[in-house]
């Protein structure tokens, strides 16, 4: 096929252009691409939407300039540009760059360079030229798993509403969407049906709800059978057997704070000094409202902190705090983009960095933003590394953006000047020695 081409569907003009560099020299120049682009875009209709494709990102900043040389420049913002799709960086990443989406998807066969799972992306453009996306995870057969109530455990009623059993289910299928999830609660001794119904979708993976429990089921061993129905007609089923005790009281044994990955900034693996004994009993489960990637939860001040990721244009991304004992949501702070990796806590402050290179410091009690910094990666647009904090200093960023910040004020203490970064290993910063 041609090296570059364009086509129209509805009110959208799609333009596919080639990369200007690679393992071997090309038989075309950026000037050749510029000349074709200029002529092609001169023919589009007024107010027609424009969506661009290229192997690489045109510009990491918001300028959206195509530059062949100083005398041959095209400004894509002069058109009704809606998005640019690219793949060179090998990660899953969506940015809203001042009204234009840049959308990158990792490789289908092996996932992203940043450990992103294998995936593909579904993109829709409606009659009003609005773009929606859904990242689909690959190679997953129809599956379903019951998160709560857990198999062979005792389950209690909700702490807020009496006689209601909380239910949480994870289900997914690569080739089709989950249309609905149903449940049947039955007596495990005689298989007599007690109640049945449907669960509600919480995220693309999780469905949940509560079951109104009859009073005469107290203390009985019950079976919960859940079934996922997928849009192509396939199904998946799972069963959990448990004992229902309405007033079952769980004992919480609090250990030391776990304020960063592996408990300390050296990531040497924290020591659990609590008196926990096996087997463990699920105390609570909750849903953050979005997916979680490499961010492990941290615990401090009787709170559990976690951050979420969303690789779609919805950018449903948050830093969340939950009550340690009940799982109740205490606060939620919306970030500009996905927090892909570890977060940290010290002296009442939670710190996190998102994929768009924003560094946040939040008050752990209220979730209020204390300060925010922009991490400059010197033309590289994506931050997937984890940060840490130690003795009042936040260590964040990577490469040209690797910096130390005062935890209380956000003031920059130092910035790395010795080396830069590109695509490579995904890390969490570690404090070693003094």
Please tell me what each predicted stretch does.
Residues 144-246:
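Long, low-complexity serine/threonine/glycine- and acidic-rich segments characteristic of extracellular
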Residues 251-282:
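Blade/loop signatures of beta-propeller domains
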Residues 284-298, 308-317, 329-344, 369-390, ...:
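Extracytoplasmic beta-rich repeat domains
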């Amino acid at each position: 096929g041609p090296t570059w081409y364009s086509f129209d569907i509805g009110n959208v003009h799609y333009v596919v252009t080639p990369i200007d560099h690679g393992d071997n020299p090309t038989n075309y120049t950026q000037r050749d691409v510029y000349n074709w682009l200029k002529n092609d875009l001169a023919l589009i209709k007024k107010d027609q939407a424009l969506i661009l494709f290229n192997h690489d990102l045109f510009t990491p900043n918001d300028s959206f300039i195509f530059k062949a040389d100083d005398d041959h420049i095209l400004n894509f913002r002069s058109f009704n540009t809606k998005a640019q799709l690219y793949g060179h960086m090998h990660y899953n990443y969506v940015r809203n760059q001042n009204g234009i989406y840049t959308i990158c998807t990792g490789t289908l066969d092996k996932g992203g360079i940043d450990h992103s799972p294998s995936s593909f992306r579904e993109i829709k453009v409606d009659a009003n030229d609005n773009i929606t996306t859904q990242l689909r995870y690959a190679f997953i057969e129809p599956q379903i798993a019951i998160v709560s109530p857990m198999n062979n455990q005792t389950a209690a009623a909700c702490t807020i509403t009496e006689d209601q059993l909380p239910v949480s289910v994870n289900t997914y299928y690569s080739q089709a969407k989950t249309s609905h999830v149903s449940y049947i609660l039955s007596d495990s001794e005689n298989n007599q049906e007690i109640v049945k119904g449907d669960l509600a979708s919480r995220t693309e993976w999780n469905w949940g709800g509560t079951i109104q429990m009859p009073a005469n089921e107290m203390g009985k061993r019950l079976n919960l059978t859940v079934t996922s129905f997928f849009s192509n007609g396939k199904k998946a089923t799972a069963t959990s057997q448990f004992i229902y005790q309405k007033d079952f009281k769980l004992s919480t044994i609090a250990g030391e704070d776990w304020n960063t990955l592996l408990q300390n900034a050296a990531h040497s693996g924290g020591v659990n000094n609590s008196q926990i004994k096996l087997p463990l009993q699920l105390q609570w489960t909750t849903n953050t409202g979005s997916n979680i990637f490499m961010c492990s939860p941290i615990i401090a001040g009787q709170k559990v902190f976690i951050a979420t990721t969303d690789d779609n244009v919805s950018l449903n991304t948050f830093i969340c705090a939950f009550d340690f004992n009940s799982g109740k949501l205490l606060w939620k702070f919306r970030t500009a983009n996905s927090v892909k990796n570890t977060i940290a806590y010290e002296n009442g402050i939670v710190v996190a960095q998102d994929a768009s290179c924003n560094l946040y410091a939040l008050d752990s009690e209220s979730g209020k933003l204390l300060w925010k910094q922009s991490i400059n990666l010197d033309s590289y647009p994506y931050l997937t590394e984890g940060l840490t904090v130690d003795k009042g200093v936040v260590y964040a960023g990577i490469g040209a953006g690797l910096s130390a910040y005062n935890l209380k004020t956000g003031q920059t203490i130092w910035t790395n000047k010795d080396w830069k970064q590109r695509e490579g290993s995904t890390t969490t910063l570690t404090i070693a020695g003094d």
